[in-house]
Amino acid sequence: MVYAIVRAGGRQEKVSVGDFVTLNRVPGGAGSTIELPALLLVDGDKVTSAAADLAKVTVTAEILQDLRGPKIVIQKFKNKTGYKKRQGHRQELTKVKITGIK
């Protein structure tokens, strides 16, 4: 089984060909392809982690859609002063399909 650890959207993800991964928003529209930098490559028993070898490895992904994550609510409260603050946030996300590890 071939898989790679890639840096994507500020995080590290374990991916293999055919996987669907949700990342922080990546520039580009639906249908475009992106390349993700590999940090580690595992091909059966062979593990590649040297930077010179990983520079030759490309992990390609196709952007499927841009979406937004679930809403989270942030609340602040100070006792005895009447201070209350409420704020919501929805993270911008991108769903991609890993198309190749070469």
UniProtKB/Swiss-Prot annotation:
GO molecular function, one term: rRNA binding
One GO CC annotation: ribosome
GO biological process, one term: translation
Keyword Ribonucleoprotein carried by entry: yes
Keywords annotated in UniProt: Ribonucleoprotein, Ribosomal protein, RNA-binding, rRNA-binding
Pfam families to which the protein is assigned, alphabetical: Ribosomal_L21p
InterPro entries noted in UniProt: bL21-like (IPR028909), bL21-like_sf (IPR036164), Ribosomal_bL21 (IPR001787), Ribosomal_bL21_CS (IPR018258)
Free-text function comment from the UniProt entry: This protein binds to 23S rRNA in the presence of protein L20.
Quaternary structure note: Part of the 50S ribosomal subunit. Contacts protein L20.
PANTHER family named in the record: 50S RIBOSOMAL PROTEIN L21 (PTHR21349), LARGE RIBOSOMAL SUBUNIT PROTEIN BL21M (PTHR21349:SF0)
Family: Belongs to the bacterial ribosomal protein bL21 family.
Protein's name according to its UniProt entry: Large ribosomal subunit protein bL21
Organism name: Arthrobacter sp. (strain FB24)
Upper taxonomic lineage: Bacteria, Bacillati, Actinomycetota, Actinomycetes, Micrococcales
